[in-house]
């Protein structure tokens, strides 16, 4: 969702790179034209792309942290990510609302003239505003612990997906993946027909099930149309840095409402929808990273309260079995953060103490098989 980036900004976990078209990407061979299906990337193309090269390096660094075949295959699949040509989008600076070229052209002329054109390059395609898609390995480890070891043929929903990178990795392993998010930035970025639909299998992946990506913009589960587009029968629902108590139920007054997330439905309706959206035996994994909480004298930071916004009793009342509730994953996420250099700036200088300013809490619930 569009408030997820606050965590990265607060922690100063700034990823390298930035906006702007990669030199030569407009005409470089190997990058498909708009609407053409993505093909498997060659080693030479990976070497030519700073973004894909970075992801490959991150995957190699993170491999020693993996504890399951699922996360190992997830990281291995980075070698099959396609090159991406820059995309044009338009932004209304007053509200930070983004528009695709088609959406911009549909606006009346007075509004069109108020928009600023911007180029979203390959780095933004995979990292968007929220950092490395490979940071999903910790959430996937907890899913694997619940006998979710092979995604081929499985249906996965990401609530507040924030980036297509991890969705494409899962789809390349054979999963039918749906991402739902109201953020206009994502809707303006992922407009090519090749961004969704069937995804070619990653090198070494099973070919018995072809994966796919579906992207849905809107407020789930408030909007009826969005509920219909998302559908039911999911084997896994992921929520990373979205369903935080600080975002959904802040303990102090927050003046800037953009820091919060309004689910637009009651807790009961939301959890009942989770139950109905999961297949029997399906899992929900809520994985939240957060910085140190503010003291009583400091300004309240909604992103720093990473607890589940729902109680154990609420989950159980909705018919869901609680496997883990606000379980700590601090040590593992700090190891990951150091490998991804979340504690360093672009010059390699240490700017944050992850031992005292990076934490992770995870909640896992299951819809009973019967």
Q: Where are these predicted regions, by residue range?
A:
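Conserved alpha-helix/loop element of class I SAM-dependent methyltransferases that forms part
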Residues: 128-153
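A short glycine-rich, Lys/Arg-flanked "PGG" loop and its adjoining helix->strand segment in the class I
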Residues: 252-280
